[in-house]
UniProtKB/Swiss-Prot annotation:
Bias kind Basic residues: ranges: 100-121
PANTHER family recorded: 30S RIBOSOMAL PROTEIN S13/40S RIBOSOMAL PROTEIN S18, SMALL RIBOSOMAL SUBUNIT PROTEIN US13M
A biological process from GO: translation
Protein name: Small ribosomal subunit protein uS13
One Pfam family in the UniProt entry: Ribosomal_S13
Highest taxon listed in the record's lineage: Bacteria
Source organism: Synechococcus sp. (strain WH7803)
Gene: rpsM
Protein family according to the UniProt entry: Belongs to the universal ribosomal protein uS13 family.
HAMAP family to which the protein is assigned, alphabetical: Ribosomal_uS13 (MF_01315)
Record's function text: Located at the top of the head of the 30S subunit, it contacts several helices of the 16S rRNA. In the 70S ribosome it contacts the 23S rRNA (bridge B1a) and protein L5 of the 50S subunit (bridge B1b), connecting the 2 subunits; these bridges are implicated in subunit movement. Contacts the tRNAs in the A and P-sites.
Length: 121
């Protein structure tokens, strides 16, 4: 297994697909990296030479990926919560942020139902 950006990428997949296992690299960015480094996208990871792996490591360092990207996203959410804007409050309350309805639906964001006992007559 080749290790790029602290991630073991799968040996038997094409390098174009294998790069997408790194958080922050999708298919388009993987294609960009491969065109810059001159590595054939159809090459399997197990067939890569050490020089190619070094080129790929250097090319991925130009992007914010993995832990840095996760930290950056977390800080952005924390900033919204700290300034007390509507989006930050919705994140804090685990409600949908982008204006979706909550009277019905929104089960994924709100979690499982909490059943409340009915009123006795």
């Amino acid at each position: 297994m080749a290790r790029i950006a602290g991630v073991d990428i799968p040996r038997d997949k094409r390098i174009e697909v294998a790069l997408t296992y790194i958080y922050g690299i999708g298919l388009t960015r993987a294609q960009t990296i491969l065109s810059k480094t001159g590595v054939n996208p159809d090459t399997r990871v197990k067939d890569l030479e050490d020089g190619d792996v070094q080129k790929l490591r250097g090319a991925t360092e130009a992007f914010t990926i993995e832990g840095d990207l996760r930290r950056q996203e977390g800080m952005a959410l924390k900033r919204l919560q700290d300034i007390g804007c509507v989006r930050g409050r919705r994140h804090r309350m685990s409600l949908p942020v982008r204006g979706q309805r909550t009277r019905t639906n929104a089960r994924t964001r709100r979690g499982a139902r909490k059943t409340v006992a009915g009123k006795k007559k």
